[in-house]
């Protein structure tokens, strides 16, 4: 809750008085700065050392220590943060009382008199005016800010367990949350700066100026916090700590950002970019590019009720196909295990409900996918299979042993939890759902194998869990797995997918999707249809998420158990989603390269439009589709937009109110100029070859779209084995020039020829169509003013030019 007005005033004036007498830690620099490869160490008069590492032309790292010994953090040690930075041309010089570190991208200025830091871009423009570092020696600042944060958040509540776990009570106890030796980083803010990111730490805003964020993974509250903030001014900060930390963004003082570390450490990265999207790219370069799931994983995943058995699930699988509702994957909740909630490494199939192997072969090795049992039968129907897991294990054992192997040192000899899952992989399991039980729980009494306590390990555990899961699957199968976990921290985006956990598929989940996207997390989803009062509205949001999860673990979310209108709505959205798979997967590949999310918050997509600063109930789904949720109105940015349901073209720069059709759940608009690749209907991704592609074109002056593709399953994309196809549309007067670019790049299984079916929205019927200068007779014009043109691309490496007159 907010602090009381009188306390706020008292703290404000107390702080102003204290600032006059504070000893800033970096109050003076002695001579003799040490320089090594892209790293500069400055000894300070107070016996501390400041280390500035130039990571790239846009990224610098700043560390403060009592000794000139800047050892790797656990995030580096365990392979979560990038350490293999390329050499950057950087120089250090003295100029009018300041030490200046210069690269082609920025100037880092350290004032010798005040100890303050500032950042300028390559052109000399001031990006960050003032950065000050306060440590435990400056207790008044740390204490006053800490008191204010405790008033704001209240006493921290711990314990209670995870829903479904046998240990779950829901009863939480209050404890103090601020450490005894904090450090504070203070950054001056420009008057009009807005701030985004922080992971899933706010369910009231996506623009965080004026509030504080608590960076600690907490069940059902802040499950994937990210110690990362993104400024609208084109810079960002990553606070490199796994201890409890806070961002106070213009709340305590309107013109200040405070980074409060409970551990006393000070280690942060500053990133510069010409746009917010560039800064996100820098952040995921540091913490890991987003994971690219297998192509099929971007479709619908369905989890049945916990009392279902193999026959119920197989009947569901057949019913989806009969109802012509595309679905990619089934997962099984804990009932697949012989022992419910089995945390051990000796778990076996529940032979009464889900016999994944013949009972007489339980002890037989090696394991294999049995051709007559349910796993193989699912695969024959085109489905994938995932299993629910719960984990309660010290993951530093495997992490430390990996380092020991690399250094040719003895290993621990202790158990690595994930290794036993390889038997299930051999039996045909395609992925895993990682439950938060015990991992999102706190373990204040636990001493980890690496010597750390839970204060340092709790946030880090949220990354090690999906990391070790992915590494195990990849090491054993050599292909991409489907795995997701509702917890996370910095770096989690690199190791798998996420959901909003046990928070349903309503407005809370929406905030999580937007805030995580603004933090470089691409593969987000929710428990679609849970905790929603309007099923159609829940479907509208759910089917326009990066991947779709229907979790019916205690419910009956099967579409055939819905009223007819809802069942038909479900079918429509599932089919639309399936047809959009080339568009969605292309956005996923882009995200894996740049950190650009599939669900794009409006201020990220339209940063120069101040009306989008804190828009919640709408977002861009990829580059060209705008989704409005839980409302019949939305704001259209400047330009022209097409109502997808009605076909009506509308001018932007205003808020519009539109009728939502009875069999739809929200608003959907197409950006004028859009080119959207879709597939013809399939029951699952990969049912038919993708050598025929439909292009939905909405001409508006000149526009382009680039389709990204790869093999959809291997890790070859990491080697650059992807392909791009650029489409260009130029509308001038009554003529449309459309160019299908030749495919650039390659991947295994890439089509050598392709058929394009163009569907071009037009005002009136054209007179003629030409393909590569030859008049075409293979076109028609519909009553809804859509020109349909068939183009057979005999050689995918060559351009095709189409002219419509």
Language-model regions, residue ranges each:
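Catalytic and substrate-binding clefts that recognize carbohydrates or anionic sugar/phosphate headgroups
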Residues: 92-294, 304-305, 310, 317-322, ...
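Bacterial Sec-dependent N-terminal signal peptides
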Residues: 1-37
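Catalytic core of carbohydrate-active enzymes
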Residues: 471-472, 478-481, 491-497, 518-522, ...
């Amino acid at each position: 809750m907010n602090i009381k007005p009188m306390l706020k005033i008292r703290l404000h004036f107390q702080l102003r008085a204290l600032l006059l007498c504070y000893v800033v830690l970096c109050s003076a620099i002695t001579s003799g700065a040490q320089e090594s490869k892209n790293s500069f160490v400055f000894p300070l008069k107070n016996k501390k050392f400041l280390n500035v590492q130039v990571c790239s032309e846009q990224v610098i790292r700043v560390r403060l220590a009592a000794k000139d010994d800047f050892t790797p953090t656990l995030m580096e040690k365990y392979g979560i943060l990038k350490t293999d930075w390329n050499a950057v041309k950087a120089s250090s010089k003295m100029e009018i009382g300041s030490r200046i570190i210069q690269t082609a991208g920025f100037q880092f200025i350290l004032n010798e008199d005040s100890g303050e830091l500032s950042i300028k871009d390559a052109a000399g423009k001031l990006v960050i005016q003032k950065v000050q570092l306060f440590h435990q020696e400056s207790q008044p600042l740390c204490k006053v800010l800490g008191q204010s944060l405790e008033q704001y958040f209240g006493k921290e509540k711990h314990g209670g367990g995870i829903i479904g776990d046998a240990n779950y009570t829901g009863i939480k106890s209050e404890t103090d949350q601020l450490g005894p030796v904090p450090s504070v980083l203070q950054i001056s803010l420009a008057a009009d700066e807005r701030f985004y990111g922080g992971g899933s730490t706010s369910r009231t805003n996506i623009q965080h100026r004026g509030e504080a964020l608590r960076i600690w993974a907490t069940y059902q509250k802040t499950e994937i916090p990210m110690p990362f903030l993104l400024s609208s001014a084109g810079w960002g900060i990553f606070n490199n700590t796994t201890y409890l930390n806070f961002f106070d963004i213009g709340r305590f003082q309107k013109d200040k950002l405070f980074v409060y570390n409970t551990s006393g450490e000070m280690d942060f990265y500053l990133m510069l970019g010409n746009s917010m999207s560039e800064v996100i790219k820098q952040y995921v370069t540091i913490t890991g590019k987003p994971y690219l799931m297998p192509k099929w994983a971007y479709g619908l995943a369905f989890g049945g009720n916990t009392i279902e058995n193999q026959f119920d699930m197989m009947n569901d699988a057949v019913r989806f196909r009969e109802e012509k509702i595309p679905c990619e994957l089934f997962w099984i909740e804990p009932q697949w295990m012989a022992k419910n909630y089995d945390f051990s490494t000796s778990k076996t199939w529940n032979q009464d409900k889900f016999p994944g192997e013949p009972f007489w072969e339980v002890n037989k090795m090696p394991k294999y996918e049995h051709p007559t049992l349910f796993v193989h039968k699912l695969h024959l129907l085109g489905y994938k299979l995932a299993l629910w897991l719960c984990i309660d294990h010290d993951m530093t054992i495997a992490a430390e042993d990996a380092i020991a192997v690399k250094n040719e040192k003895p290993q621990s000899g202790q158990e690595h939890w994930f290794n036993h899952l390889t038997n299930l992989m051999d039996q045909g399991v395609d992925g895993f759902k990682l439950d938060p039980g015990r991992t999102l729980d706190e373990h204040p009494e636990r001493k980890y194998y690496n010597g750390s306590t839970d204060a340092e390990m709790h946030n880090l555990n949220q990354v090690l869990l999906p990391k070790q899961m992915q590494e195990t699957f990849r090491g054993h199968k050599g292909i991409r797995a489907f795995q997701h976990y509702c917890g996370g921290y910095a770096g989690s985006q690199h190791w798998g997918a996420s959901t909003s956990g046990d928070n349903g598929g309503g407005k809370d989940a929406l905030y999580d999707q937007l805030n995580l996207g603004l933090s470089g997390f691409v593969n987000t989803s929710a428990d679609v249809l849970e905790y929603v009062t309007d099923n159609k509205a829940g479907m509208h949001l759910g089917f326009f998420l990066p991947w779709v999860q229907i979790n019916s673990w205690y419910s009956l979310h099967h579409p055939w158990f819905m009223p007819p209108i809802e069942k038909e709505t479900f079918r429509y959205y599932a089919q639309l989603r399936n047809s959009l798979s080339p568009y969605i997967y292309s956005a996923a590949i882009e995200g894996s390269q740049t950190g650009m999310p599939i669900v794009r918050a409006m201020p990220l997509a339209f940063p120069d439009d101040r009306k989008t600063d804190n828009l919640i109930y709408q977002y861009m789904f990829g580059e060209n589709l705008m989704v409005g949720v839980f409302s019949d109105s939305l704001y259209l940015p400047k330009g022209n937009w097409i109502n997808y349901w009605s076909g009506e073209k509308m001018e932007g720069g205003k808020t519009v109110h539109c009728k939502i059709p009875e069999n739809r759940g929200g608003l959907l608009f197409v950006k004028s100029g859009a080119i959207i690749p879709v597939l013809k209907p399939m029951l699952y991704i990969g049912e038919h070859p993708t050598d025929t592609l439909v292009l939905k074109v909405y001409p508006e002056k000149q526009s382009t779209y680039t389709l990204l593709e790869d093999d959809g399953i291997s890790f070859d994309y990491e080697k650059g084995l992807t392909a791009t196809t650029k489409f260009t549309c130029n509308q001038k007067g009554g003529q449309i020039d459309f160019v299908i670019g030749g495919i650039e790049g390659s991947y295994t299984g890439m089509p050598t020829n392709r058929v394009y079916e163009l569907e071009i929205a037009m005002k009136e019927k054209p007179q003629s169509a030409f393909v590569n200068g030859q008049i075409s007779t293979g076109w028609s014009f519909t009553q809804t003013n859509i020109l349909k043109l068939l183009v057979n691309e005999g050689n995918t490496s060559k351009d095709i030019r189409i002219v419509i007159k």
